[in-house]
């Protein structure tokens, strides 16, 4: 991605883009060594939805819907819900407002972003929220300030001034969140870098963590079929992802399948079945596959599917 970007554009015009790509790769590497941070966030979201006091539950619902009473913050989350995107600065402001002004659990704010952002990424989203909350760099928080918004997004304040006193400079005291995750580094799993073509009936499971099977090390395989399962990112997530996020995922998978069909000259299929593990096993059985190959997923929802997928394949 960076090579192609820099081939087409001068560095000064894409520097921020390059930085964001590098940050995403850094976050992915950090989370890969500390998978319990992802697991802990998932557990906390479930626990909080079950145990929140009713008043806090209603406030979570109001702020997440853009009904907090601070107009510029409400405009940010309303744009997110409507489009699936907001500028990176706005993401930081709203996250800080949620945690330090509203004093709501960071885990539930991260869940709002994860459900609505079209570019939601398990590592970048979870760890960025932890950073704002003072967990990623222990004790270092990020506080939203009206003067900062006025500097970088003056039009936002001009048209949305109601409640601005709540984020005036010096009005917000930081909240240091409690740490629930085990952040001890773990060894990385050593996956094979080459898949030998042993003349067996092979199929590729194409998933959202890597949509370039036509690039090595899988590029030279002779395949029976390639399949993708649109519910893989949603299967383990409650509440459900937004319809816009699901549609974006389905579009990306369809594009990957189209390129796979052209490159490998084999049939492809895309399923929207609610149980991707069962559907994957049925696909393997239907085509008489002897091996199912996939790129190793990074820590996140696709990796969470590996145990049930393995269990289903072992039974088929």
Where are the regions a protein language model picked out?
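Structured secondary-structure scaffolds
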Residues: 1-122, 131-137, 144-209
């Amino acid at each position: 991605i960076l090579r192609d970007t820099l081939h087409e554009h001068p560095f000064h015009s894409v520097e921020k883009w390059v930085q964001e790509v590098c940050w995403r790769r850094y976050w992915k590497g950090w989370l890969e060594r500390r998978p319990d941070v992802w697991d802990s966030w998932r557990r906390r979201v479930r626990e909080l939805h079950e145990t929140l006091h009713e008043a806090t539950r209603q406030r979570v619902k109001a702020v997440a819907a853009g009904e907090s009473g601070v107009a510029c913050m409400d405009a940010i989350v309303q744009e997110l819900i409507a489009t699936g995107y907001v500028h990176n600065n706005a993401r930081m402001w709203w996250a800080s407002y949620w945690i330090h002004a509203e004093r709501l659990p960071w885990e539930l704010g991260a869940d709002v972003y994860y459900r609505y952002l079209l570019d939601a990424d398990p590592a970048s989203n979870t760890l960025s929220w932890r950073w704002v909350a003072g967990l990623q760099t222990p004790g270092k928080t990020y506080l939203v300030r009206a003067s900062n918004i006025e500097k970088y997004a003056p039009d936002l304040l001009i048209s949305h001034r109601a409640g601005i006193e709540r984020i005036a400079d010096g009005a917000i005291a930081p909240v240091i969140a409690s740490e629930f995750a085990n952040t001890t580094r773990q060894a990385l799993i050593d996956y094979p870098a080459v898949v030998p073509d042993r003349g067996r009936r092979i199929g590729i499971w194409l998933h959202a963590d890597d949509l370039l099977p036509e690039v090595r090390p899988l590029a030279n395989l002779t395949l029976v079929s390639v399949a993708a399962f649109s519910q893989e990112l949603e299967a383990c997530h409650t509440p459900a992802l937004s319809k816009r996020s699901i549609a974006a995922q389905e579009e990306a998978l369809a594009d990957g399948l189209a390129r796979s069909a052209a490159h490998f000259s084999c049939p492809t299929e895309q399923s929207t079945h609610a149980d991707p593990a069962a559907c994957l096993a049925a696909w393997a059985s239907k085509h008489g596959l002897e091996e199912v190959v996939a790129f190793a997923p990074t820590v996140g929802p696709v990796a969470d599917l590996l145990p049930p997928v393995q269990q289903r394949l072992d039974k088929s």
